[in-house]
């Protein structure tokens, strides 16, 4: 009899926790403190009438345990594998500002992070 009450209370508590977890919007928690990937004006290099834009914002990233099959093929085995995409320029144009060649981004998207490539 005691075990039945204990199991019933545990199931009820579990269902309440699931309900509370669904009250929070998921997209708010995922992007906390970071805006989506888009063009923003670079205030340092922009001049009146000649704005310079660059891609800024957040994209997808995650970490998960490394599968055993993959771990066996690694030169230096690691327990955690991570994947990430970065906010990068999809299209750009070369511009000249104060005799300095700059890359002015014209379109952005989430793609492979350059610093992760080897």
UniProtKB/Swiss-Prot annotation:
Gene3D superfamilies per record: Cystine-knot cytokines
Alphabetized InterPro entries for the sequence: Cystine-knot_cytokine, Glyco_hormone
Transmembrane portions of the chain: none
Keyword set, alphabetical order: Disulfide bond, Glycoprotein, Hormone, Secreted, Signal
Disulphide connectivity of cysteines: 34-58, 37-87, 55-108, 59-110, 86-113
Superkingdom of origin organism: Eukaryota
GO CC field: extracellular space; follicle-stimulating hormone complex
Family matches, as Pfam families: Hormone_6
Subcellular localization(s) per the UniProt record: Secreted
Residues modified by glycosylation: 79, 104
The family this protein is said to belong to: Belongs to the glycoprotein hormones subunit alpha family.
Listed name of the protein: Glycoprotein hormones alpha chain 2
């Amino acid at each position: 009899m005691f075990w039945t009450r204990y199991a019933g209370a545990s199931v009820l508590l579990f269902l309440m926790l699931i309900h509370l977890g669904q009250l929070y919007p998921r997209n708010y928690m995922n992007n906390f403190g970071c805006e989506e990937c888009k063009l923003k004006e670079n205030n340092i290099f922009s001049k009146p009438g000649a704005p310079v834009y660059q891609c800024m914002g957040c994209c997808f990233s995650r970490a998960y345990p490394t599968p055993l099959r993959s771990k066996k093929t690694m030169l230096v085995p690691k327990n955690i594998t991570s994947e990430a995409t970065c906010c990068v320029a999809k299209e750009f144009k070369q511009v000249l500002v104060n005799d300095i060649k700059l890359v002015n981004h014209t379109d952005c998207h989430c793609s492979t992070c350059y610093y992760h490539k080897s």
